[in-house]
UniProtKB/Swiss-Prot annotation:
Additional note from the record: The influenza A genome consist of 8 RNA segments. Genetic variation of hemagglutinin and/or neuraminidase genes results in the emergence of new influenza strains. The mechanism of variation can be the result of point mutations or the result of genetic reassortment between segments of two different strains.
Functional description taken from the UniProt entry: Catalyzes the removal of terminal sialic acid residues from viral and cellular glycoconjugates. Cleaves off the terminal sialic acids on the glycosylated HA during virus budding to facilitate virus release. Additionally helps virus spread through the circulation by further removing sialic acids from the cell surface. These cleavages prevent self-aggregation and ensure the efficient spread of the progeny virus from cell to cell. Otherwise, infection would be limited to one round of replication.
GO CC list: host cell plasma membrane; membrane; virion membrane
Segments on the Intravirion side according to the record's topology features: 1-6
Residues spanning the membrane: 7-27
Comment block on domains: Intact N-terminus is essential for virion morphogenesis. Possesses two apical sorting signals, one in the ectodomain, which is likely to be a glycan, and the other in the transmembrane domain. The transmembrane domain also plays a role in lipid raft association.
Region described as Involved in apical transport and lipid raft association: spans on this chain: 11-33
Highest taxon of source: Viruses
Entry-linked Pfam families: Neur
The protein's name: Neuraminidase
Gene3D superfamilies reported for this sequence: 2.120.10.10
Amino acid sequence: MNPNQKIICISATGMTLSVVSLLVGIANLGLNIGLHYKVGDTPNVNIPNVNGTNSTTTIINNNTQNNFTNITNIIQSKGGERTFLNLTKPLCEVNSWHILSKDNAIRIGEDAHILVTREPYLSCDPQGCRMFALSQGTTLRGRHANGTIHDRSPFRALISWEMGQAPSPYNTRVECIGWSSTSCHDGMSRMSICMSGPNNNASAVVWYGGRPITEIPSWAGNILRTQESECVCHKGVCPVVMTDGPANNRAATKIIYFKEGKIQKIEELAGNAQHIEECSCYGAGGVIKCICRDNWKGANRPVITIDPEMMTHTSKYLCSKVLTDTSRPNDPTNGNCDAPITGGSPDPGVKGFAFLDGENSWLGRTISKDSRSGYEMLKVPNAETDIQSGPISNQVIVNNQNWSGYSGAFIDYWANKECFNPCFYVELIRGRPKESSVLWTSNSIVALCGSKKRLGSWSWHDGAEIIYFE
């Protein structure tokens, strides 16, 4: 090849490479423009909710493989804003209960860093449901687990974690510090309340939106305490039941109405209920009902009915002859709507719940009438109003060969249904005092929700072998 031919060949090659480079550049530019303007075709992105007027959220996606940065501006309109929860829907019809979640915390804790907890519950928000409990500030295998049978210490805190997981130092967040708690979401943000301090001068701190808003001092100097399960909000108003005073005599109970963590109204307990502790509350049809524990006298549970719009309440006892506290006597021939039914030993009571909805009413109780073992759900039509109402069906949740504990109500109020589906949890206590070969007291959780279908029973017990911890 002569010199001229070489020059022509090199020039042609150079021109070809230039054209190819130009085409690649044009394609790259087109790709960038296409990705920029086709926001509607991108995958769903979790965009923070903004409670103000229209705002701009900027998302920067770095794609190192293609060596470009794509900056996308997404305009959020008022249509995407949150609103306060409205409790106008009725309860769903329930014919049985389906499993929702079981964390197996004790079983997993035999070989993992699982926190010692008690007084657990579940609570939902617009994004989903989380598990809550009062941590003891130590793990099952930690040396500080010795002595965690005690309810009140400076080391306890209300923690929450993703539903279905076991609580560990790595997946939990602290909601507030204390040894008694309640928490609920009003549709805009979460309110959490924790009690802490010495028995004779405890106080409550009310958190809203992740910040402390209100403090409440003790009013009777005897273990200021609250629900140990979720509160419920309606149009921004969140009533909470608190008690201060003796556990075995008349105490001072108040219903405190909060909005955005600030007190709107305080009511002294009114009605026939003589002692109130550890209420399990739910809302439907614009009304909030709290089924509580009479630790002084009653084996029948007190019921507080709250009108959150008027900020008023009444109280009475569950009328049914089916007694649901533990310990309790045998079910009598007739119930009592206006006074406690006494009897039962040795335990004065346990936290429990019910869903009271006419023919669609369900009561939960331990299978044993003397100890916190086993758990069953009983369908008892008109249990709230009929002194002769009895069960027409039942479902075993935990068999009587296994320990249960506290139980309580919750509802996913943001589920896409035409009614509010009742749900409940059962605390599965392990360790002391019943199993004294270990130094700790802790629990796992099982949660179930209502089904219109008629499903079978099974025992959802804790399942940990205590011998593995010895």
